[in-house]
């Protein structure tokens, strides 16, 4: 989630990213969050298929952005991505080079926008295809380690 968030934020010129996780949550209508990071990368050559599996955008969907205050970001981190409006939110991971300040507004690359959030803010289609962003981002590395998740 950290690498995907950094990739999506940098590709869209966003200040930070909120990436929802595709964890199983009892009581939700489907077994999976289709707007979240769904897998891990392992020590091996990474293929386009590997990227399509982990990316919330799959093969061809674009990255969404929103403008949020630090307080809204904090609230979303506490509640998660409530995909079904039932209060059972998929957790968000914050990927940011700085700790968001409560009163400041940030452009956020976001993976998982609930109906409530969409009603409260403007969701923008960045026009950047997630797979294209991932190929450019991951293609810059010959190897990837946990240290590469750092964004400063």
Predicted regions, residues:
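Catalytic centers of hydrolytic enzymes
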Residues: 1-152
